[in-house]
Amino acid sequence: MSSQTVARIPVVDFSKADCLKPGTSSWLSARKDVCRALEELGCFMAILPSKVPPELHKTIFNAFDELFNFPVDTPDNPLRAGYVTSCSGQNTFGIINGTNPQETQEFTHLFWPNGNDQFRETADLYAKVMAEIDEAVTRMVFENYGVEKYHDDHFRSTFYYLRLIKYEVPKKLGVDVGLRSHTDKTFSSILHQNHVTGLEINTKTNEWVVFDPLPSSVIFMAGDVFQVWSNDRVRPCRHRVTLKENEVRYSFGLFSLHKGVIHVPDELLDKDHPLRYKPFNHLEFLRAQKDLSETEYAAKAYCAI
């Protein structure tokens, strides 16, 4: 009788109090799981019960209901600056430097001139938690590859783009594509969503695995720039969104960008891992995307040797 292994998205438990403290046994255990997941699939689900409690989850997505009901889609509306809509039914607000409380406050004031402390404080807290996870995960990877001495400089050059995303109820369940198959042009991406499924992850064997979220979880995904930095050790996470439920799908995402030049550390080069990428400026890379084929892994098309 033959058996078939069903691919699953790896889960890393960050519930222990010292799991984000470098050098502890919990840290070292999580580091092993994180690196294995990023090398094999390019992503993992992080469980964060103490940092993302159910009441926080409920608060942020209740606020989304109000936020996305504001009439922003008019040509003369100043709110359009951070608003994107698409024919696939995806609507997005974006905040540059989204971990800066001042930026969140200014964004909040555009919609609620008299203030909305609950939304602002909850969005700030989510951004803070996600940035903390991003710093910890990248530090784990740097440590694992023996280049931890570069991590502080790397993190100082990191800034974040915060996105608030709504997928409308699909016209045809299981057929409508909310987001086509792609890899992110980031160093890393972290998403937290409501209960409505739709995010699917592509495996090395070209299977599509559905991400089944928990209220206390986020999904960490490696982007193209992480792949370049690691000289192909880390797999960029190819993913898509297929709308299969008769409900609105909300997602809250933090995307890490790098100010300056990305290059492969010398320590990651050996006879089995020759240099595969030229140094490149991340922001220039983003500006060049309109000239690259959407079917390619963008980093390989842009700076592969």
Where on the chain are the PLM-derived regions?
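Peripheral, non-catalytic segments flanking oxidoreductase cores
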Residues: 1-305
